[in-house]
């Protein structure tokens, strides 16, 4: 029977579970445990001799180390980079100098480190405590040492041991490591950093600091009966030998950490968690050779902090740190997550998830802890709001960050990855919704309290302070700059919670102009809060009244109708004061100075735009500078906030408040700004400009403001740069710039416009105000250009209408009356600005304005007359007339425009509103403006007409004359549309120009007429057109679709039967 081979001095058969080494002399195999050779040491042995062979061949020899790289096998001749943690690296690290930690580390006593201190000053910098007294921390006696750790924890407990030289880890029993620690001949540098003993007997003699127990999420908010176990990160024992080194790292979950040195000493290398440093850290950690690069060389500053025996160090969330142990050391530490640095914790957690690096001190179930904290935040906010108390700003900011993380974790594409850490019996969607609601309520209350503090500061100003008119323009222009809400902390790691509550008494000192530009970034919040108090205000009582009104709105959101009435009555009382005129004049002067100084240096807008902006400055100053610093806004299921009063039409609370936009560049929004799913209240710092404007409503108190200022009778307007409050620009503040002229105002004295007709042929005639035989008064506009008159006569002949005054004579008189009552604001786009070229030469023809009271009565009468005359006009039976409910964004003929979708120019819209407008003062002219639709249409018509007539009607002499006429008319029209200033020959009026450039708006009218285009031939009547057709082709049988003049013109000009001009 064959025998089993045996090996080693123990003469046992081969065991696959035991490490064995071969002797180079006798070629026999020996167990490592029998001959005293560890498995980790074997790669370093060059020639091994067993105990028997050592007597004859000598001792074993080790490989010569050519480099301190962990990948080096000793066989390659090249020199590799120094490995982090190697002996050469430790020697170099000890000799280097680093900036002192005095700049960043805060030194306190144990009794000073309280929850109130951290809430006021934040926890953004490391805190060093010299003695443990006052910390509420329990530590063993100074005689406690490593052997006692083994007795309390157990000798057979497996621990993770880090080989510092190679920066690798392996498992080892605690007894074996303690034997290594006490041995005099240490062949390696081993380090134990993750011995967690919260469940061991040693937990009874070691207690974390009291401040940690108060802040820790796991200690306070994790239920004891939860299925998912608590993360065991609160109590660690660190047993480190001399020259132990832990490379740069961020604690898992972005946790903060505390260290207490019981014996020995530790050196910390600290790096601030700025955005740049975090990006560098992520790039460094993800590189394959990061263990060969010292990360401190890549950042601006790395601080060195020495922690001696008996001292305690608290390191905040996100700080990148490395640890060197210069002497044998026994220390205790613990990790904790808290509400003071939620933003940084989330950022660090995201970095950790992207890197996917296994850590020896993981923070398991971090997301579960966040869910429990979110539930706590909801209960906390509800309780505080019921008690009419305000949660701390850092708590509100933390709740916003957590709720944003909840949303990303519960998205459909990310739910599978995160659902394992979702607590049982948790309804995430309901929690997100309820928490968002409480956050918004808290933010609104915070804004109200901030405005009340600003009011107190204004009242505390000395009575002999300078009036607002004498302050420099820079102080007034400051509120237009973006201002961050006081309750939101900075996205960067620089003390987000500091300097928020205090400093209101110092606000009166802020208006010193030389010191304002020198405010540093750290003091922005204080300075911006100060600037709110410098807004020109002569009567603090008005501001207090508005703020009390805003507070009532917050407390009684279930009574919107009552609040609207009280709000309006308060605002009316504020504005009906005798010295309002003087105040508005001063504000207007400030706006002018502010605009000039602002763009003089920035040079970001041309002068022409500045002049246009100045026309609306006065109206906006009534709200932005008088007494309204904050307002509340609702949008369609997206919650935003604004510095100005801004509401949408679907809001139930502020339905009567005008939506006013600021015309200034909008800064980038806060990266953690929260937008809710419900239409509820929130303050938005930087409102977003929207394309679609809601229907505007006027303030009742704005109309009251206008009345005391405007004179009762004013024969003509002054040609000054600054407009008086009764000009059309003031009144047209509430008219949308997107050609929507419907204005609604319950409390306004201006009557409601019921909309114009969808423009057809007669609307074009109304726009041009041209019918034969009309007498124009001195105040009216001059007649249309000859080319336009001919085109209109052609359209009349097509529609079988006579050139008479029956339809349009009353309209002209009505439109003149309407110009006195309704101000139709010209478009703010540059395309509509070309009409101002001729206006500067004849400012005396500007119509005088009537008072609002008389205009409301006249406009209603004139509107009824329009209805009667327009209904008597001709309607084409083949044309479908749309209703007045159609809007520009949803055109009725949208489904019919399927043939030509790739045209360069938009076809003429039947719903466009073209009407006469009062010229605005000093608007910039557009040089060389052209309209492609008119030019291409006329050119195509001329080319086709000439081509057909040359082939078919060569015998007729009249055909030879049509070609130059058509070409001349097309050139004339294109020249008229592009010329910035009207010439005496053309005598083109403003309405003609606005139609040709596509920016006109329609005046009154209820029935849409048949759409048409400019024609190049004048056809006086339908009878003459038929005679003309018969004379041209007397004997030939005409083709189908070319029998009548209307059909031929339609073919030539490519008029589709539904009325669109197809090019």
From Swiss-Prot:
Comp. bias (Basic and acidic residues): 513-540, 723-745, 920-929, 965-975
Key words of the record: Activator, Centromere, Chromatin regulator, Chromosome, Dioxygenase, Iron, Kinetochore, Metal-binding, Nucleus, Oxidoreductase, Phosphoprotein, Transcription, Transcription regulation, Zinc, Zinc-finger
Polar residues composition bias: residue spans: 776-791
Broad class of enzyme this protein falls into: oxidoreductase
Annotated positions binding 2-oxoglutarate: 246, 259, 266
EC number: 1.14.11.-
Zinc finger regions, PHD-type: 5-56
GO BP annotations, alphabetical order: chromatin remodeling; negative regulation of rDNA heterochromatin formation; protein demethylation; regulation of transcription by RNA polymerase II; transcription initiation-coupled chromatin remodeling
Location of the protein in the cell: Nucleus, Nucleolus; Chromosome, Centromere, Kinetochore
One GO term describing the cellular component: nucleolus
Biased composition (Basic residues): 746-755, 842-852, 953-964
Main location class: nucleus
Family, similarity comment: Belongs to the JHDM1 histone demethylase family. JHDM1D subfamily.
Function as written in the Swiss-Prot or TrEMBL entry: Lysine demethylase that demethylates both histones and non-histone proteins. Mediates demethylation of dimethylated 'Lys-9' of histone H3 (H3K9me2). Recruited to trimethylated 'Lys-4' of histone H3 (H3K4me3) at rDNA promoters and promotes expression of rDNA.
Protein name listed in UniProt: Lysine-specific demethylase phf2
Protein's gene: phf2
């Amino acid at each position: 029977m064959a025998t089993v081979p045996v090996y080693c001095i123990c003469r046992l058969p081969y065991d696959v579970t035991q490490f064995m080494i071969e002797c180079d002399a006798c070629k026999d195999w020996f167990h490592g445990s029998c001959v005293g050779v560890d498995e980790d040491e074997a790669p370093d042995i060059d020639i091994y001799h067993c105990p028997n062979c050592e007597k004859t061949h000598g001792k074993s020899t080790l490989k010569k180390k050519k480099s301190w790289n962990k990948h080096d096998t000793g066989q390659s001749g090249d020199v590799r980079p120094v490995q982090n943690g190697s002996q050469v690296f430790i020697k170099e690290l000890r000799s280097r100098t680093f900036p002192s930690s005095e700049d960043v580390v805060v030194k306190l006593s144990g009794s000073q480190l309280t929850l109130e201190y951290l809430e006021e000053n934040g926890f953004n910098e490391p805190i060093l405590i010299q003695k443990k007294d006052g910390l509420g921390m329990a530590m063993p006696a100074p005689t406690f040492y490593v052997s006692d750790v083994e007795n309390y924890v157990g000798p057979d407990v497996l621990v993770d041991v880090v080989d510092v030289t190679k920066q690798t880890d392996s498992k080892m029993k605690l007894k074996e490591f303690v034997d290594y620690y006490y041995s005099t001949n240490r062949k390696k540098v081993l380090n134990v950093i993750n011995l967690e003993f919260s469940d061991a007997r040693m937990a009874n003699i070691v207690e974390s600091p009291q401040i940690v127990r108060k802040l820790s999420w796991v200690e306070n908010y994790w239920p004891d009966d939860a299925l998912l176990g608590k993360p065991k990160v609160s109590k660690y024992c660190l047993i480190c030998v001399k020259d132990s080194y832990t490379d740069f790292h961020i604690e898992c979950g972005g946790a903060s950490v505390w260290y207490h040195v019981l014996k020995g000493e530790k050196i910390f290398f600290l790096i601030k968690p700025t955005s740049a440093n975090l990006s560098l850290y992520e790039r460094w950690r993800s590189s394959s050779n990061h263990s060969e690069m010292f990360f401190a060389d890549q950042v601006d500053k790395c601080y060195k902090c020495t922690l001696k025996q008996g001292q305690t160090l608290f390191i905040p969330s996100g700080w990148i740190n490395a640890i060197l142990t210069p002497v044998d050391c026994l220390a205790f530490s613990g990790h904790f997550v808290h509400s003071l640095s939620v933003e940084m914790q989330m950022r660090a957690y995201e970095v950790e998830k992207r890197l996917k690096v296994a850590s020896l001190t993981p923070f398991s179930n971090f997301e579960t802890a966040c869910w429990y904290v979110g539930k706590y935040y909801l209960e906390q906010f509800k309780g505080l709001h019921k008690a009419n108390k305000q949660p701390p700003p850092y708590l509100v900011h933390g709740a916003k960050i957590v709720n944003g993380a909840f949303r990303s974790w519960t998205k459909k594409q990310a739910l599978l990855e995160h659902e394992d850490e979702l607590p049982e019996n948790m309804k995430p969607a309901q929690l997100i919704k309820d928490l968002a609601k409480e956050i918004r309520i808290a933010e609104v209350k915070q804004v109200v309290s901030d405005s009340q503090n600003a009011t107190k500061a204004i009242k505390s100003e000395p009575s002999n302070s300078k009036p607002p008119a004498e302050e420099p323009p820079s102080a007034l222009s400051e509120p237009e700059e973006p201002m961050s809400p006081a309750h939101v902390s900075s996205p960067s790691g620089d003390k987000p919670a500091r300097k928020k509550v205090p400093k209101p008494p110092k606000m009166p000192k802020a208006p010193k102009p030389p010191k304002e530009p020198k405010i540093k970034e750290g003091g922005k919040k204080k300075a911006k809060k100060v600037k709110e108090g410098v807004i020109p205000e002569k009567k603090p009582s008005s501001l207090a009244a508005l703020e009390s009104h805003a507070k009532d709105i917050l407390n009684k959101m279930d009574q919107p109708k009552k609040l609207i009435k009280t709000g309006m009555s308060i605002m009316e009382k504020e504005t009906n004061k005798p010295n309002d005129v003087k105040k508005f004049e001063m504000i207007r002067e400030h706006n002018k100075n502010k605009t000039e100084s602002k763009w003089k240096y920035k040079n970001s807008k041309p002068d022409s735009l500045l002049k246009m902006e100045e026309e609306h400055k006065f109206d906006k100053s009534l709200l932005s500078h008088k007494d309204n610093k904050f307002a509340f806004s609702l949008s369609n299921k997206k919650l935003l906030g604004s510095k100005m009063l801004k509401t949408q039409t679907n809001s139930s609370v502020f339905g009567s408040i005008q939506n006013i936009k600021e015309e200034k560049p909008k800064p980038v929004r806060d990266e953690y700004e929260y937008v809710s799913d419900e239409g509820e209240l929130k303050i938005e710092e930087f409102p977003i400009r929207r394309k679609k404007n809601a229907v505007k409503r006027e303030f009742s108190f704005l109309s009251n403001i206008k009345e005391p200022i405007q004179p009762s009778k004013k024969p003509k307007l002054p040609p000054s740069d600054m407009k008086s409050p009764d000009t059309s620009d003031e009144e047209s503040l509430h008219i949308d710039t997107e050609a929507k002229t419907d204005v609604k105002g319950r409390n306004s004295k201006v009557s409601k416009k019921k909309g114009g007709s969808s423009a057809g042929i007669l609307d074009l005639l109304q726009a041009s105000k041209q019918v034969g035989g009309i007498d124009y008064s001195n105040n009216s506009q001059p007649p249309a250009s000859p080319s336009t008159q001919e085109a209109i006569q052609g359209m009349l002949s097509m529609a079988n209408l006579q050139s008479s005054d029956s339809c349009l004579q009353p309209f002209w008189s009505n439109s003149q009356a309407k110009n006195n009552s309704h101000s139709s604001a010209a478009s703010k786009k540059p395309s509509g600005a070309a009409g101002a070229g001729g206006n500067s030469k004849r400012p005396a023809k500007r119509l005088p304005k009537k008072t609002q009271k008389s205009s409301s009565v006249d406009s209603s009468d004139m509107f009824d007359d329009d209805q009667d005359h327009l209904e008597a006009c001709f309607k084409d039976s083949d044309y479908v007339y749309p209703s007045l409910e159609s809007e520009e964004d949803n055109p009725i003929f949208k489904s019919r425009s399927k043939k030509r979708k790739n045209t360069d120019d938009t076809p003429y819209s039947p719903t466009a509103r073209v009407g006469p407008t009062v010229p605005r003062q000093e608007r910039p002219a557009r040089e060389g403006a052209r309209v492609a639709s008119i030019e291409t249409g006329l050119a195509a018509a001329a080319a086709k007409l000439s081509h057909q007539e040359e082939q078919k009607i060569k015998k007729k002499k009249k055909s030879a004359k049509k070609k130059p006429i058509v070409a001349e008319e097309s050139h004339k029209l294109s020249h008229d549309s592009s010329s910035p200033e009207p010439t005496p020959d053309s005598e083109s009026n403003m309405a003609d120009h606005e139609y040709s450039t596509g920016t006109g708006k329609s005046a009154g009218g209820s029935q849409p007429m048949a759409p048409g285009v400019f024609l190049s031939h004048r056809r006086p009547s339908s009878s003459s057109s038929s005679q003309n057709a018969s004379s041209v082709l007397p004997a030939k049988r005409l083709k189908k679709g070319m029998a009548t003049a209307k059909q031929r013109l339609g073919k030539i000009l490519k008029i589709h039967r539904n009325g669109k001009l197809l090019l």
